[in-house]
A protein has these predicted regions:
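N-terminal charged/capping segments associated with class I S-adenosyl-L-methionine
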Residues: 1-132, 145-165, 206-207, 324-353
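Soluble or luminal CAZymes and related metallo-dependent hydrolases
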Residues: 27, 177-181, 246-250
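Short, conserved SAM-binding segment of the class I
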Residues: 132, 181-188, 192, 257
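Mobile active-site "lid"/loop adjacent to the S-adenosyl-L-methionine
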Residues: 139-184, 203-240
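Helix-to-beta-strand junctions that scaffold the AdoMet/dcAdoMet cofactor pocket
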Residues: 151, 193-195
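Substrate-binding/catalytic lobe of Class I Rossmann-like enzymes that use SAM or dcSAM, i.e.
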Residues: 195-319
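C-terminal target-recognition/interaction regions appended to catalytic cores
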Residues: 289-358
Length: 358
C-alpha cells in the first residue's frame, strides 16, 4: 500500500497561499517551524538532517521544510549544510520528486544553497536511516495508509471503507493492523531520531464520537459503484473487493504505544491535537455558491488519492483495460452527486509531536 503523502497540488499560479490550503498544512507548518527553532543542532561541519517520511512528489512538504530551514538559518551560519532525506516506497515517482525540488518556486533547494536533497526508496515500517541521525522529521497524510494492501485484508461487501461496514471481523482486523503499523512506525523513528530530535506527524484521526469523517465523499463513491454494477460496467464481486485501506486513529490509539509509562523507544509525546481541519472547497462554495465547482474539486481530490486503489480490485487489476474508464466515470459520478447535494466535509486530523529524550 502507499506510504506517500496524499498530494494536494497547488492551483494554477502555484502561490504559497494556495498550497497552504491543504487541510491542516498551514497549522502544521507553523508548529514545524517552532520545532526547528528549538531542536538541538549538530555543530558544523556535521549536517543538520531533516527527514521527510512518505514524500510522494514533495508537494506537501516543500513549505514545511522550507520554514524549518529558515528557522535553522536564524541559529546557524548560512553555509551550515542541511541534508534533507525524502523517503517513500521504491515504486514512488522519484523523478517527479526531484523535478519538484528543482523547478518549483517554493522549493527549499532553490532558496537555500546549503540545502542538499536526497531520497531513500524503502518502507518506513523498518529502520531506513542510521540510528540517532535525524534532527527533525516530518510526515503528513502518510501514516494513515495501512501497510498491507486491501487484497490481503478481509473483504467486506457493504462499503468501501471499513469504518462504515457492519462486518465486525473486518473491522477488528483493520483496527489491529492500524495499531501494529503505528507501533512500528513510531518504534523505528525512535531509533533514527538523534537525542533531543523531534518528529511531527499529521495524519487522519477520528473525532470524539469515533467518526472518521468524509461522509459525503464515501456515500457518493458507494452510490456510483452501485450504479455501475446495475449498468453492467462492474461485477458485484469486483465492488466487494474494493476498499480504501486508510484508517483514522483516536487519541487513545495514538497514545497506545507509549502506555503505561508515557515513553516508547526513548520517545515521548510532546504535543497531540485532534481537530477538524478546514474544508477549503466548502469555504469557497459559501462565497461563490458554485456547487459544480465544489463537486468537481472534491471528486478530483479523491480520484487522485484513492481511485487507483479501487481500480486495482478490477478483474484485471491495474492492467484491466477498463481501468482508465472506471476512474473517469467514477470521478464524474462523484462530482455530479456532490454538486446535486452540497455538504461540508468533515476532515478529522491529528497533529502529533514526538520528542527523543536527550
Amino acid at each position: 500500500m502507499p506510504e506517500s503523502s496524499i498530494v494536494v497540488r497547488p492551483e494554477p499560479g502555484g502561490a504559497p497561499s494556495n498550497r497552504l490550503q491543504a487541510a491542516g498544512l498551514a497549522h502544521a507548518t507553523g508548529v514545524f517551524a517552532q520545532l526547528a527553532a528549538t531542536v538541538p543542532l549538530p555543530a558544523a561541519p556535521r549536517p543538520i538532517v531533516v527527514a521527510d517520511y512518505g514524500a510522494a512528489t514533495g508537494y506537501n512538504s516543500l513549505l514545511p521544510i522550507g520554514a524549518a530551514i529558515a528557522a535553522f538559518r536564524r541559529r546557524t551560519r548560512t553555509d551550515h549544510a542541511v541534508l534533507v532525506v525524502h523517503t517513500d516506497l521504491p515504486d514512488n515517482d522519484f523523478t517527479a520528486l526531484f523535478t519538484t525540488l528543482a523547478d518549483d518556486p517554493d522549493s527549499y533547494a532553490r532558496k537555500d544553497t546549503a540545502s542538499f536533497p536526497s531520497a531513500i526508496g524503502r518502507s518506513f515500517y523498518s529502520q531506513i536511516l542510521p540510528s540517532q541521525s535525524v534532527n527533525l522529521g516530518w510526515t503528513s497524510w502518510s501514516t494513515m495508509w495501512l501497510r498491507r494492501p486491501a487484497g490481503e485484508l478481509p473483504e467486506f461487501a457493504d462499503h468501501v471503507h471499513v469504518e462504515h461496514s457492519d462486518d465486525d471481523t473486518a473491522r477488528r482486523v483493520y483496527t489491529r493492523q492500524a495499531a501494529q503499523d503505528w507501533h512500528d512506525f513510531v518504534a523505528f523513528r525512535g531509533r533514527e531520531l538523534s537525542p533531543g530530535g523531534k518528529l511531527l506527524v499529521l495524519t487522519a484521526a477520528v473525532d470524539a464520537a469515533g467518526r472518521s469523517g468524509y461522509g459525503p465523499l464515501l456515500d457518493a463513491i458507494v452510490a456510483v459503484l452501485d450504479e455501475q454494477v446495475r449498468d453492467g460496467a462492474l461485477t458485484r464481486d469486483e465492488v466487494a473487493r474494493m476498499s480504501i485501506p486508510v484508517l483514522g486513529r483516536s487519541e487513545k490509539e495514538l497514545r497506545a504505544p507509549f502506555a503505561p509509562a508515557g515513553r516508547f523507544e526513548s520517545l515521548t509525546i510532546e504535543r497531540l491535537e485532534v481537530f477538524d481541519a478546514e474544508d477549503r472547497f466548502w469555504d469557497r462554495y459559501l462565497l461563490d455558491g458554485d456547487a459544480v465547482a465544489l463537486g468537481t474539486h472534491w471528486a478530483a481530490f479523491v480520484s487522485a488519492a484513492v481511485f487507483p486503489t479501487l481500480a486495482s480490485a478490477l478483474a484485471g487489476g491495474t492492467d484491466d483495460p477498463r481501468a482508465a474508464d472506471f476512474v473517469r466515470h467514477l470521478e464524474a459520478g462523484v462530482a455530479a452527486r456532490l454538486a446535486s447535494n452540497p455538504q461540508q466535509v468533515q476532515i478529522p486530523l491529528a497533529l502529533i509531536v514526538l520528542a527523543k529524550q536527550r
